[in-house]
């Protein structure tokens, strides 16, 4: 469901979207696509799969000349029903949605929500440290 559902829905909608003057697909992906956590190996494995799907699909859509923008909203630490009572420093669902919509409006391919930009920076500067931080969650 974490990978197959969004990928299959996108596949089914893409032919119709390609016939529009312009269209967007925004795949909301956990920041765990960048580095996994210890407690959820299967869940964490599905996140890079969805991110890879988005990147490959973006290249295919561009090559085909379709007017469809494929975007990724990568988010960490969002306060949802699933995460209530766990972790600190979470942003609200409304703040996450606002950041994604801002990135959509700016046409960004990858939209970093909340602490995701910080995680990217840590992973760029010290991949081992970033993974140790995340795997301990």
Predicted segments, located by residue:
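Active-site loop immediately N-terminal to the catalytic Tyr-X3-Lys motif
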Residues: 37-42
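C-terminal helical subdomain
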Residues: 72-73, 84-124
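Active-site helix of classical SDR
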Residues: 10, 46
């Amino acid at each position: 469901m974490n990978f197959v559902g969004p990928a299959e829905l996108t596949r089914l909608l893409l032919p119709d979207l390609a016939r529009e003057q312009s269209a967007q697909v925004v795949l909301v992906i956990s920041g765990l696509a960048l580095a996994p956590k210890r407690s959820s190996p299967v869940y964490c494995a599905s996140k890079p799969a969805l991110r890879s799907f988005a990147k490959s699909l973006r290249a295919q859509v561009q090559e085909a000349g379709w007017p469809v923008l494929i975007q990724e909203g990568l988010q960490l630490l969002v306060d949802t029903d699933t995460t209530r009572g766990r972790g600190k420093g979470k942003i609200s669902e409304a703040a996450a949605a606002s950041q994604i919509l801002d990135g959509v409006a700016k046409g960004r391919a990858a939209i970093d929500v909340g602490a995701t930009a910080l995680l990217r920076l840590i992973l760029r500067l010290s991949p081992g440290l970033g993974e140790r931080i995340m795997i301990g969650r």
